[in-house]
Each structure stands twice: as C-alpha cells, then as structure tokens.
C-alpha cells in the first residue's frame, strides 16, 4: 500500500481583505503553515509554463529548447474595471458558515466521488479567505445542485460568481482553474437544443483547452501531483463521453494523443473504495463513449 500523500496547493487568488473587501492586487501567498503540519507536495510555480509538444514530432537533431529563455512571470494585478465587476457581482460574499458547511458536505459526499478533482487540503486546512474564491464558488455550486434548494442561496448565484471570477482571470493557478471549471458542469440551465455559453458542453471545450495547455494528456511521471493530474484528466474524459452520448456532439478529446495511465489506488492516496468506484465509472463511461463514436462514424 502506498503511503498517503498530501497533494495540496497554495491558493493564489485570495481577493478578500480582512475587512471583507476586494484587494487591488487580487493575490497573496498563504502564510507559513504551523509546525507539525505536513507540507504540501503540490506547489504552484511562480512561472507556470504551458505544455509544448514540438519535440514529439521534431527530429532530435533539430535544436529546439522549449524551456529556454522563459521570462519570469510578473504577478498580475486586477484592473480597476475588473475589481468593479467583481465588486458588483459580490464575489467575496460567501454563505454563512452552517450553509457553507452543509453545501461542502454535500459536495464531498455526492459530487466528489464522480468528479474527484479537488484536494481536501485545499479547503479543509485553510480558512475561507485563504481558499481560491473561484474554487469555493464552484464547489458550492456543485453542492447546491445535489442538496435541497435554499431560497437565499440558489445554484445560479454561485455559478455567476464563479463565471465572473473565471473570465476576469482572478485565479492564476491553472490546475485550480481546470478543476473549478470542471465543477461548473454541474450547472446546466439549458437543454442541448439551445445555443448557450453556460452549458456543460461549453465548459467541456474550455476544460479541454486548459487540459492540453497544462499537459494533462501526458503521463505525469515523477510529478508530486501525479495522482491529482490523472484524476482531473479522467474526470474530463468521463464528461466528454457522457456529453457525447447525451447530446450527440463530437468528442472534444482525442485519446489517441494521450498516454495517461488508468486510475489506480495510488491516485487516491491508497484509498481502495473511492479508487475502485471511480475507476469503474471511467471504464463504463469510456465504453459508452467509444460505442457512440463507432455509431457516429459508421465504423462498427
């Protein structure tokens, strides 16, 4: 049995000041963790580089170095216009603690087993003001979709806040952005017969683009966050298969270009039950997706 790992990350988008307002910079690092607490094995890089696959099709004798000459990333400050938009949408306002805990419990119990893209340490080991607002609203959205309706805390409210945080680039960590965007699939206000920028099919394409940029389609050999990356990738594959089957839309992902290994117990830090459940879910979804593709292309 593999030892459990703590695959957490430091949030970059805490825009809430101690007084509850929005900060001009929009970002700050976590404070140092107390002594005795296990340090995170997933640390966001100050100079996040997207995946480049040029060396996979260029000959070895072609002098290409994708990592050379990369400029240091300058911390981005939200513009005054961005801050006004975020303030108007009241993105820094979260539900009261009892409501928040209830929705988070619903997320972990009913959503996470099927979309295991969030590390518990991202949320449980931090206060609300130390967690990505984009991630929090995405999780609250998902939790509210599988809970009894609360008149004052509708799913649409969480969705709109997460959406504006996404489009204003309030979150910088691409892994958290991808995970949160995957959770927006739980909001699907319109049927497939309507053209919409708010459906799961739309966000699927956004997630696909992010996944390829981050390189989630490649086996994360030797990475501390390998299990997290595999879970995010296969969660995206599942959504692609289900949307393909439910809506009849072409697949967004080409699995022939991916070499990510199947889900295993290691990816769930040694937890057998959730690993087996998600692995079976992925397998069934892939069979369904391949069957639909065969029918659509008349290959069967």
Model-derived segments and their meaning:
Residues 2-110, 211, 278, 282-300:
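Intrinsically disordered, low-complexity activation-like regions
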Residues 87-281, 285-300:
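Acidic, Ser/Thr-rich, low-complexity intrinsically disordered regions in fungal proteins
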């Amino acid at each position: 049995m593999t030892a459990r790992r703590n695959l957490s990350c430091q949030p970059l988008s805490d825009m809430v000041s101690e007084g509850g307002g929005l900060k001009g910079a929009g970002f700050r690092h976590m404070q140092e963790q107390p002594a005795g607490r296990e340090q995170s094995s997933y640390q966001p890089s100050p100079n996040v580089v997207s995946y480049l696959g040029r060396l996979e099709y260029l000959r070895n004798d072609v002098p290409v170095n994708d990592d050379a000459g990369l400029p240091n990333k300058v911390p981005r400050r939200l513009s005054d216009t961005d801050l006004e938009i975020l303030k108007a949408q009241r993105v820094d306002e979260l539900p009261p603690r009892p409501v928040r805990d209830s929705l988070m419990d619903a997320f972990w119990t009913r959503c996470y087993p099927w979309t295991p893209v969030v590390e518990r340490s991202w949320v449980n080991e931090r206060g609300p003001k130390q967690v990505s607002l984009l991630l929090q609203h995405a999780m609250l959205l998902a939790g509210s979709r599988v809970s009894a309706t609360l008149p004052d805390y509708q799913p649409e409210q969480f969705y709109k806040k997460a959406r504006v945080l996404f489009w204003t680039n309030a979150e910088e960590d691409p892994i958290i952005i991808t995970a949160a965007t995957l959770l927006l699939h739980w909001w699907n206000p319109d049927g497939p017969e309507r053209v919409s920028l708010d459906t799961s099919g739309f966000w699927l394409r956004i997630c696909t683009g992010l996944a390829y940029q981050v390189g989630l389609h490649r086996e994360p050999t030797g990475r501390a966050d390998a299990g997290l990356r595999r879970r995010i990738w296969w969660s995206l594959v599942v959504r692609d298969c289900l949307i393909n089957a439910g809506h009849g839309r072409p697949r967004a992902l080409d699995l022939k270009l991916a070499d990510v290994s199947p889900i295993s117990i290691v990816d769930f830090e040694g937890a057998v039950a959730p690993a087996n459940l998600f692995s079976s879910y992925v397998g069934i979804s892939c069979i369904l997706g391949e069957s639909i593709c065969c029918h659509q292309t008349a290959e069967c």
